[in-house]
Swiss-Prot record:
It catalyses: 2-formamido-N(1)-(5-O-phospho-beta-D-ribosyl)acetamidine + ATP = 5-amino-1-(5-phospho-beta-D-ribosyl)imidazole + ADP + phosphate + H(+). This is Phosphoribosylformylglycinamidine cyclo-ligase. Pfam families: AIRS, AIRS_C. Gene3D superfamilies: PurM-like C-terminal domain (3.90.650.10), PurM-like, N-terminal domain (3.30.1330.10). HAMAP family: AIRS. GO terms for biological process: 'de novo' IMP biosynthetic process; adenine biosynthetic process. Signal peptide: none annotated. Keywords: ATP-binding, Cytoplasm, Ligase, Nucleotide-binding, Purine biosynthesis. One of its GO terms (cellular component) is cytosol. The keyword Iron-sulfur does not apply. It comes from Limosilactobacillus fermentum (strain NBRC 3956 / LMG 18251). GO terms for molecular function: ATP binding; phosphoribosylamine-glycine ligase activity; phosphoribosylformylglycinamidine cyclo-ligase activity. It is found in: Cytoplasm.
Length: 345
């Protein structure tokens, strides 16, 4: 053992990790991706793209304290999907096609098997999004983190034709709001989730409450964030959608109004889509108010599209053909003076 290892950093574990992840990283390659693991920087050739006036759209995000659920379950192979989803769904909301992704893992101890599981999830997320995993960093920091702790973040870059960029001035009064089903909690609100499960109660993550329909609590809360790129991007390229909202921290109340201008109001019918069991379970167990839920969780909708009425049937049909559950959840109207930008009924 050398002095660096004595200090808590094992470079050989890093070399072992690179060997383990090489094939997963390679599986994400797409046109434009150059090189492979080992270069000083990730490379992407924009000349491969058929874009006349490209605008690059970048996003960075993490997974938050959902990582502590993964740690408690010792299940690390899906949390990477979450970090990709949080980033790619954000750039999709601007109209952009994800091109490439970079991940960052910080840990107290580089366990190659665990780190490889995390990267396998990142690679799976990249495949779902059509983005190349062109680089990343695993930082072993023994005095910053405990041995079994890690943090995970990522950055995506996407591209959109300048004329196709989605901005808040595009949605118009009369547009119909179509909600796309979430897969569960996604990656926001986990400080409240953990408060309910572990502090207010001592819930066993292996328990199967009746409200969860056969799922364990752990399975329900760790379900990976849905990636909407493949069903939604073709609709954007065909100019069938005039606004997209990614429903993340703050739920519909915070995120839906970001999609449109201050002169409009979103009127949302909360009975228009089915409630997910995980939210019913958390609401009852935690004694949460309706306001608590709407201000914290996605409540079953991970993305909302603004579509003109004459295009709604076509968009719904194409989403259904892509296997995407879609609900007509409301509309945009001219905002009455003094009222909020969103009303949920």
């Amino acid at each position: 053992m050398n002095r660096y290892q004595e200090a808590g950093v094992d470079v050989n574990a890093g070399y072992e990790l690179v060997k383990r992840i090489k094939e997963n990283v390679k599986s994400t390659n797409r046109p434009g991706a150059l090189g492979g693991i080992g270069a000083f920087g990730g490379l992407f050739d924009l000349g491969e793209l058929k874009v006349k006036h490209p605008v690059l759209v970048s996003g960075t995000d993490g997974v938050g304290t959902k990582l502590l659920i993964a740690k408690a379950m010792d299940q690390h192979d899906t949390i990477g999907i979450d970090v990709v989803a949080m980033c790619v769904n954000d750039v999709l909301a601007q109209g952009a096609e994800p091109l490439y992704f970079l991940d960052y893992i910080a840990t107290g101890h580089n366990d190659p098997a665990k780190m490889a599981d995390i990267v396998a999830g990142v690679a799976e997320g990249c495949r779902q999004a059509g983005a190349a995993l062109i680089g990343g960093e695993t930082a072993e920091m023994p005095d910053m983190y405990d041995q079994d702790e890690y943090d995970l973040a990522g950055t995506v870059t996407g591209v959109v034709e300048k004329d196709d960029l989605l901005t808040s001035d595009q949605p118009q009064a009369g547009a119909i709001l179509l909600g796309l089903a979430s897969s569960g909690i996604h990656s926001n609100g986990f400080s409240l989730v953990r408060q309910i499960l572990f502090k207010d109660h001592q819930v066993d993550l292996a328990a199967t409450p009746a409200k969860l329909g056969g799922q364990t609590v752990g399975q329900a809360v760790l379900a990976p964030t849905k990636i909407y790129v493949k069903p939604v991007l073709p609709l954007l390229k065909d100019h069938l959608v005039e606004g997209v909202a990614h429903i993340t921290g703050g739920g519909l109340i915070e995120n839906l109004p970001r999609m449109f201008g201050d002169d409009l109001q979103a009127q949302v019918d909360s009975s228009a889509w089915p409630s997910l069991p995980v939210f019913d379970y958390l609401k009852e167990l935690g004694g949460l108010s309706d306001d608590d839920c709407w201000q914290t969780f996605n409540m079953g909708l991970g993305m909302i599209l603004a579509v003109q009425p004459d295009l709604v049937d076509q968009v719904k049909s194409r989403l259904n053909q892509a296997g995407e559950a879609c609900y007509q959840v409301g509309q945009l109207v001219n905002r009455p003076a003094g009222e909020e930008k969103i009303v949920i009924k």
